[in-house]
Amino acid sequence: MKLLVVLCCFFAVYSLAAAQGGQEEFQIKVRICGRHLARTLADLCPNVEYEDVMKRSGARSPALYGTVGWPWARPGAARGKRAGVADDCCVNSCTMDVLLSYC
């Protein structure tokens, strides 16, 4: 319920700012994390469901590590750090345009 109120306030202020076209354009930045971020994306993006956003990658089988010849390697150890919606909207503040770009 709190999230709905926050989103309504966010959209109201965003709409007021967009309505003043002759003045300098500004965008409100918000910081949203965790389940609130997932719920917001699910609400903003019509083709994304909350359960899909909250799913994590499936566990990898330890038996696979030996097949590539690196039994000491951990899953994901070779992957670099990827920036994503959590970096854009939780670590840093993001605008409505940034949120919509993840739809």
From Swiss-Prot:
It is found in: Secreted. Heterodimer of a B chain and an A chain linked by two disulfide bonds. The keyword Ion transport does not apply. It comes from Agrius convolvuli (Convolvulus hawk-moth). It holds the Pfam family Insulin. Residues 1-19 form the signal peptide. It comes from the Eukaryota. The lineage of its organism: Eukaryota, Metazoa, Ecdysozoa, Arthropoda, Hexapoda. Keywords: Cleavage on pair of basic residues, Disulfide bond, Hormone, Secreted, Signal. This is Bombyxin-related peptide A. The keyword Metal-binding does not apply. Belongs to the insulin family. One of its GO terms (cellular component) is extracellular space. Residues 57-80 form a propeptide. GO terms for molecular function: growth factor activity; prothoracicotrophic hormone activity. InterPro entries: Bombyxin (IPR017097), Insulin-like (IPR016179), Insulin-like_sf (IPR036438), Insulin_CS (IPR022353), Insulin_family (IPR022352). Located in 4 pairs of medial neurosecretory cells in the brain.
